[in-house]
């Protein structure tokens, strides 16, 4: 992946690699089990009943967004999806779900009208896949948000392999090239087909399949039990 920031410091890379390995290995990952899940998570069999008619309206808007895809270019799809989901309220997992880290499905994000950066990125990824954009053009990308000094997730879009990708970020309404986002330092990225670790000189290392990410597998399993629009 092209570099997000040309000047990477050694100390930053030590921090990032520590973060990356803690996120990649299941032994270091806190996964929500049925026994540990808050009632809010377990009660999602009928989200519209739980959250009311406004939730249904948001889901209908999602359906309309996907239905319009055949008339749109890829860039128009990116712009509309980014704008649509960025209307949702940002809420930390501990406040929203009662757990430290939870990856919500797009349905959960929309019906509850709240989520964090992972939830926004996941929803955009699966929506764009439904709109016909191939998996190898999209990656969920963990970065360090330098201004916030914290881990953050964005969705990146590659028109062709190896080019400077576009960044879809819940903190920024506009879509910019990664090379223009010098506030973001990439750690690793993944999609349904692979997992890549960012390298110091702006390249990347393919390190396996996304099955290594237990939280990803868990959210995909839940999405498969839901009915996408």
Describe the residue ranges of each PLM region.
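Hydrophobic h-region of N-terminal signal peptides that target proteins for export
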Residues: 24-32
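Bacterial N-terminal signal peptides that target proteins for export
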Residues: 5-20
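A structural boundary/capping signal
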Residues: 2-5, 31-229
């Amino acid at each position: 992946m092209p570099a997000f920031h040309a000047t990477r410091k050694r100390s930053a890379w030590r921090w990032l690699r520590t973060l990356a390995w803690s996120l990649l290995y299941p032994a270091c990952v806190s996964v929500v089990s049925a026994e540990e899940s808050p009632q809010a998570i377990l009660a999602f069999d009928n989200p519209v009943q739980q959250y009311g008619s406004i939730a249904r309206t948001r889901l209908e808007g999602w359906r309309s967004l996907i239905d319009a895809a055949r008339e749109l270019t890829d860039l128009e799809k990116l712009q509309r999806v980014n704008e649509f989901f960025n209307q949702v309220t940002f809420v930390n997992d501990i406040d929203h779900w009662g757990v430290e880290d939870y990856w919500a499905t797009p349905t959960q994000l929309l019906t509850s009208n709240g989520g964090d950066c992972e939830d926004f990125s996941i929803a955009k990824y699966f929506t764009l896949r439904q709109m016909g954009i191939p998996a190898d053009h999209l990656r969920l990308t963990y970065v360090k948000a330098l201004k916030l000094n914290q881990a953050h997730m964005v969705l990146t879009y590659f028109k062709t392999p190896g080019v400077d990708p576009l960044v879809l970020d819940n903190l920024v309404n506009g879509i910019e090239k990664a090379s223009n986002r010098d506030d973001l330092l990439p750690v690793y990225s993944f999609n349904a087909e692979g997992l890549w670790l960012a390298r110091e000189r702006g390249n990347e290392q393919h390190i396996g399949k996304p099955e290594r990410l237990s939280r990803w597998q868990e959210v995909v399993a839940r999405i498969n039990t839901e009915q996408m629009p």
